[in-house]
């Protein structure tokens, strides 16, 4: 007995895959390209195939037309999400660039976001080290290292102490 369903084209399988990927969360164009470039799954090893660049381009273009793929929207949402998790602008910018977002798109997304990075740095420091922030030099250095690791700029970190001394 043979399989009665006809084999779907690589393009339609790629389109389905893109929709499943984008249904989970927003992705940058580079992330989606990378994920679509992997081997298309099949029922068995003979049916697995590599997606062609032309099919990937068509799927990416279709996703842009349908507004499912938008790097600017992705950057805005990513900044908001990572900011809520306590990461600073420097680290978020680096992560966005690793995900294929251009420097100009990053700059415009950060300009549009309404996050007070200095206040957020203060909140993170107080959450980690307690409400009256440490005043001795070794403890201040510890706070600075923590906030630098989280991706805050040194100006924001210094402003925490400057504004409350």
Swiss-Prot record:
Q: Does the keyword Cytoplasm apply?
A: yes
Which UniProt keywords are present, listed alphabetically? Cytoplasm
GO BP? regulation of DNA repair
A GO CC annotation recorded here is:
cytoplasm
The family database entries (Pfam families) matched by this protein are listed as: RecX_HTH1, RecX_HTH2, RecX_HTH3
Q: Which InterPro entries match?
A: RecX_HTH_1st (IPR053926), RecX_HTH_2nd (IPR053924), RecX_HTH_3rd (IPR053925), Regulatory_RecX (IPR003783), WH-like_DNA-bd_sf (IPR036388)
Coiled coil region boundaries:
none
* Location(s) in or outside the cell: Cytoplasm
Q: Which family does it belong to?
A: Belongs to the RecX family.
Record NCBIfam families? PRK00117.1-1
Function summary: Modulates RecA activity.
Please identify the protein, giving its name as recorded. Answer: Regulatory protein RecX
What species was this sequence derived from?
Cronobacter sakazakii (strain ATCC BAA-894) (Enterobacter sakazakii)
């Amino acid at each position: 007995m043979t399989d009665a369903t006809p084999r779907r084209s690589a393009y339609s399988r790629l389109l389905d895959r893109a929709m499943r990927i984008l249904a989970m969360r927003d992705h940058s164009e580079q992330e989606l390209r990378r994920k679509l470039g992997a081997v298309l799954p099949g029922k068995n090893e003979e049916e697995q195939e590599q997606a062609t660049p032309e099919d990937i381009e068509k799927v990416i273009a279709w996703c842009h037309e349908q507004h499912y793929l938008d790097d600017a929207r992705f950057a805005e949402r990513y900044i908001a999400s990572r900011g809520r998790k306590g990461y600073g602008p420097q680290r978020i910018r680096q992560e966005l660039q690793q995900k294929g977002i251009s420097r100009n798109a990053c700059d415009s997304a950060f300009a549009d976001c309404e996050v007070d990075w200095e206040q957020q740095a203060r909140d993170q420091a107080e959450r980690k080290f307690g409400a009256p922030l440490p005043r001795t030099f070794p403890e201040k250095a510890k706070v600075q290292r923590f906030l630098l690791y989280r991706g805050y700029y040194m100006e924001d970190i210094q402003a925490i102490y400057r504004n409350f001394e």
